[in-house]
Amino acid sequence: MRFHRQGISAIIGVLLIVLLGFCWKLSGSYGIVSTALPHNQSAIKSTDLPSIRWDNYHEFVRDIDFDNSTAIFNSIRAALRQSPSDIHPVGVSYFPAVIPKGTLMYHAGSKVPTTFEWLAMDHEFSYSFGLRSPSYGRKSLERRHGRFGNGTNGDHPKGPPPPPPPPDEKGRGSQKMLTYRAARDLNKFLYLDGASAAKTDSGEMDTQLMLSNVIKEKLNLTDDGENERMAERLYAARICKWGKPFGLDGIIRVEVGFEVVLCDFSADNVELVSMLEMVQPNQYLGLPAPTVISKEEGWPLDENGSLVEDQLTDDQKAILEREDGWEKAFSNFNAVKSFNQLRAGAAHDNGEHRIHIDYRYLVSGINRTYIAPDPNNRRLLDEGMTWEKQLDMVDDLEKALEVGFDATQSMDWQLAFDELVLKFAPLLKSVSNILNSDGDINESIAINATALTLNFCLPICEPIPGLKNGCRLFDLVICCQRCRRNC
């Protein structure tokens, strides 16, 4: 007896529908609010939370478009994970997050912050950003010319190169590594999914941009330095100002590792437990400060500030040879420093377990507007995200913040989804291999596919009246369809 590939594929399709339908049913049961309610209706009530049960969840859910049938699944699985966040870089959701009491966080800078500022969850992250070694030889000219830029969009400033730094700044000896400890459960953070710290214009920062735009209008912020400040600092300032009445602790973003924008260092939410002077490698190794290469010091430079090599004196050539050698050695140090940060970030591929998520108050753009299935091309702020929808999302965030978050009261959906993947991914992969094997579809292939799928369906199926001689292959499709109705 021969079987058609279409028939076997139907079995797999039904199995997937059963599995995803079961997951979607569970998500409704536990109130993931981002996709749960009809337009213009909030799921969050600060004083009267809805009771969502297996027998009434239909009142709180709506169909999700097929193209994004796995979007919420992938968003939850990628949350607080380094590589999955990079694979799905354009985030569209706000995850309520809690940083438990006693958690250590780090900041490298020249002074103790008093307002909003960045903290890193790993000291390698802060160390890499805070310790910028002075450059030697020809490399020092590149840095002074602003090759890497300091403008809002990364463009280097126009005009002549800046003067060399004053002597007391050459070693940057005032840089400090600060270690903070959470003095209480910081239970009002918003974690922005995707590669939300990426300074791009391709959507990674849409969740911050949307909040910033709505906040500007709601708070009537007409003169807050919008054109002079770096975009991410402007967003952070607005978000913290908006969130202050609600007790917002800050936002959490994904960089190489996870970073926290803490809204207020002066409150009783964190305590400074360590402050160490950061020592520059050249100071530690006893090397002199870099030679100042400028026209004032007698160096041949053209109108662009570049060295005129054929006009160098023998002494200048010797200085450059020596310092270029030091710079080459320091480049190895900087490479290892960057590698340490990458390794610290990669350690969280399986999750940043020092941060906990309360999935009950998840707010997402999924099913509010069209979200492209391609994780690299989707945008939260597309044509379908009307101003009214943006206001609705911010309204849901405000109501969630009024409640406060408690991850211990939330279903751990990431754990549940991980179990589904671990259990069923091998099954689906094996069935796919069987169906896509070379040669004609014959009884042996059909039997092998049935052997893998039969035991998945039967435990959740009722006997089918009138079915004789057991379940044949195509009878299994009917069996699974019945299971789907029962589920």
Swiss-Prot record:
Glycans are attached at N40, N68, N150, N220, N304, N367, N442, N448. Keywords: Glycoprotein, Signal. The keyword Signal applies. The keyword ATP-binding does not apply. Residues 1-31 form the signal peptide. It comes from the Eukaryota. N-glycosylated. One of its GO terms (cellular component) is membrane. Residues 141-176 are annotated as: Disordered. InterPro entries: YOR389W-like. This is Uncharacterized protein YPL277C. It comes from Saccharomyces cerevisiae (strain ATCC 204508 / S288c).
